[in-house]
From Swiss-Prot:
This is Nucleolar protein 56. The modification Phosphothreonine is found at residues 467, 545-546. The gene is Nop56. GO terms for biological process: ribosomal small subunit biogenesis. The modification Omega-N-methylarginine is found at residue 359. Widely expressed, with highest levels in the central nervous system (CNS), including cerebral cortex and cerebellum, and spleen. In the CNS, expressed in Purkinje cells of the cerebellum, as well as in motor neurons of the hypoglossal nucleus and in the spinal cord anterior horn (at protein level). Its main location: nucleus. There is a cross-link at residues 87, 230, 240, 531 (Glycyl lysine isopeptide (Lys-Gly) (interchain with G-Cter in SUMO2)). Residues 458-580 are annotated as: Disordered.
Length: 580
């Protein structure tokens, strides 16, 4: 009998479940489908065989990416090889995603099944998963799902910063909108200022230049020879400046009030600022296209290439389109109208704005548009899937389109595609090596700057951390100096050594010891008196600045102590002699 197992992928790990022996037909009954909602009844049908938790969120993200791409991860392979029976013919594995099922069947040899009964079982497992796995709560499972969802979405959205085509889509859309707005506002300025100076409309055709002139001239009656030089700077043409000056003198326009002029000038300044922003945005779009799709922009131009990417949705979608779709991209209405009325289908869409189709003869427009769409499809695929995109292939493809145009006009045979691509491959490798070399240099410079910055921060932090310790050391030194200063000046009394308490002796022993001490002390006094006087003389010579009173004051406690000792000893001896 074939054993049915079910693989369930969760944010916390893989779960392998086994179905108890129940007929497949009975599982599809409505009563059984309702029993899926009941945990107790669901346990009678399904049991957990093994659970392989993910060690970290990064591992969970890797497994989720592998499942979405239809690749068998090593963790999944280990789980299936460990817990599924060795006899693969007797095992039927139910999975939710057909891609991962096909990959498991191809790599591991297990028969996989999706849909029907498996979908109902997975619905029940998804509902009761936190009860099937021990130690897993509903709250922790929800948190794991939320974290994995955020990281998975972030990985899908996060691409190379230099190759994000979303910025191109937004830029070209804004550029088209700005063109419409500038055109509308310029026409409003022409109508508004035309009541005062109608001849200026015929002389100047450019919208931005007209708005600058309206802002500069103001009241035409104030225009004179002194402003002619400024007019030449704005119009970039001396003849036009002279014509404007002559027309202002003999204009048939009506007079205008000061408040109306103020409003016209403020509105024309807004239009001028919009036109300047449009130029800066166009420059930004060109630089972005050279980074994201250099071959496509070299072949067909930045504006047309950006419109193709925006219409397709992304550069990847454009690369997936065949040449026939690229040819009519942007002409969907005409295409479906032609299919509906069974008329002629359009020959070109957005690529009509390319210069090649405009240069071709009427009978060759369809042929050159088909050839150009083919080259655009190749260029978009090169830009999308090359590691280091360069404009070499786009330049070579442009040369091929030029040769095909000349072939249609003059009959000159173009070069073979194989020869052109060989040259392009060699040049592209050299260009890619040069780009990688520049990038490595930039990275080294950035790392050096980062190291210097970190070293400066570490030095500053070490200085800040050492300052309190240094302050404490200075404070301790100052305290020590304060303590030592009175001793050096002799103002502080030296510590007096108190006589140690001696044990009481017998009276005879005390008398004998007192007599011996008296004899020895008298002998010492006689010997030490001349030496002390001699020894005191060098000290006085060495320190002549110290006053004698202070020195005597510092010596008085020792003398007083010796004198009190000798007097007490004499009194004790006299008392003992009287008692005897």
């Amino acid at each position: 009998m074939v054993l049915l197992h079910v693989l369930f992928e969760h944010a916390v790990g893989y779960a392998l479940l086994a179905l108890k022996e129940v007929e497949e037909i009975s599982l599809l009954l409505p009563q059984v489908e309702e029993c899926v909602l009941n945990l107790g009844k669901f346990h009678n049908v399904v049991r957990l065989v093994a659970f392989c938790p993910f060690s970290s969120s990064q591992v969970a993200l890797e497994n989720a990416n592998a499942v979405s791409e239809g690749v068998v991860h090593e963790d999944l392979r280990l789980l299936l090889e460990t817990y599924l029976p060795s006899k693969k013919k007797k095992v039927l594995l139910g999975v939710g995603d057909p891609k991962i099922g096909a990959a498991i069947q191809e790599e591991l040899g297990y028969n996989c099944q999706t849909g029907g009964v498996i979908a109902e079982i997975l619905r029940g497992v998804r509902l009761h998963f936190h009860n099937l796995v021990k130690g897993l709560t509903d709250l922790s499972a929800c948190k794991a799902q939320l974290g994995l969802g955020h990281s998975y979405s972030r990985a899908k959205v996060k691409f190379n910063v230099n190759r994000v085509d979303n910025m191109i889509i937004q830029s070209i859309s804004l550029l088209d909108q700005l063109d419409k707005d500038i055109n509308t506002f310029s026409m409003r300025v022409r109508e508004w200022y035309g009541y005062h100076f109608p001849e200026l409309v015929k002389i100047v055709n450019d919208n931005a230049t007209y708005c600058r002139l309206a802002q500069f001239i103001g009241n035409r009656r104030e225009l004179n020879e002194e402003k002619l030089e400024k007019l030449e700077e704005i119009t970039m043409d001396g003849a036009k400046a002279k014509a404007i000056l002559d027309a202002s003198r003999s204009s048939m326009g009506m007079d205008i009030s000061a408040i109306d002029l103020i409003n016209i000038e403020s509105f024309s300044s807004r239009v001028v600022s919009l036109s300047e922003y449009r130029q800066s945005l166009h420059t930004y779009l060109r630089s972005k296209m050279s980074q994201v799709a250099p071959s496509l922009s070299a072949l067909i131009g930045e504006a047309v290439g950006a419109r193709l990417i925006a219409h397709a949705g992304s550069l990847t979608n454009l690369a997936k389109y065949p040449a026939s779709t690229v040819q009519i991209l942007g002409a969907e209405k005409a295409l479906f109208r032609a299919l509906k009325t069974r008329g002629n289908t359009p020959k070109y869409g957005l690529i009509f704005h390319s210069t090649f189709i405009g240069r071709a003869a009427a009978k060759n427009k369809g042929r050159i548009s088909r050839y150009l769409a083919n080259k655009c499809s190749i260029a978009s695929r090169i830009d999308c899937f090359s590691e280091v995109p360069t404009s070499v292939f786009g330049e070579k493809l442009r040369e091929q389109v030029e040769e095909r145009l000349s072939f249609y006009e003059t009959g000159e045979i173009p070069r073979k595609n194989l020869d052109v691509m060989k040259e392009a491959v060699v040049q592209a490798e050299e260009a890619a090596a040069e780009i990688t070399r520049k990038l490595e240099k930039q990275e080294k410079k950035r790392l050096k700057k980062e190291k210097k910055r970190l070293a400066a921060l570490a030095l500053a932090s070490s200085e800040n951390s050492s300052t309190p310790e240094e302050c404490e050391e200075v404070n301790e030194k100052s305290k020590k100096k304060k303590k030592l200063k009175p001793q050096e000046n002799g103002m502080e009394d030296p510590p007096v050594s108190l006589p140690k308490s001696k044990k009481k002796k017998a009276p005879k022993e005390e008398l004998a010891s007192d007599l011996e001490e008296m004899a020895t002390s008298s002998a010492k006094r006689k010997k030490s008196s001349p030496k002390e006087e001699v020894a005191s003389e060098p000290e006085e010579a060495a320190s002549p600045t110290t006053p004698k009173k202070k020195r005597k004051f510092s010596e008085e406690p020792e003398v007083a102590a010796n004198f009190t000792k000798s007097s007490t000893k004499k009194k004790k001896k006299s008392q003992k002699a009287q008692e005897d």
